[in-house]
Amino acid sequence: VSVFVDTSALLAVLSADDTEHAKAAATFGRLLERSAALVTTNYCVLETVALVQHRFGLPAVRSFHHDLLPVIDIAWIEAEDHAAGMMAMLTANRRELSLVDCTSFALMRRLGIRRAFHFDRHFREQGFQPPLAS
């Protein structure tokens, strides 16, 4: 089964100080054990790198790049995903709903991905399921 991995989950896995770190690390481990097809977008990678570099420095970016990214497929946001995401963000008219989230939703729908590993309520609001079946 394919599982989308959001920036919020990536940050929680990477940062031992994150309030969701223990849950994120356990979930990530279970997803790997179950050989889930983990997918993120190039936009989420960019967002994660920017946040990790700012908060923790380049050694943490290296760790992300060498240790975490190799087990996650990167799906590239296409022009139609970007356009759909921008339209959804502007239509929603909610400051806290980002272009990265909206393009992720568009890509997930295009690829038929129903499950998301996240700590962001917007994925639930959009009807996506938790990363692991109950």
Show which residues each predicted segment covers.
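Short active-site oxyanion
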Residues: 34-38, 71-73, 112-114
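Beta-rich strand-turn-strand
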Residues: 96-98
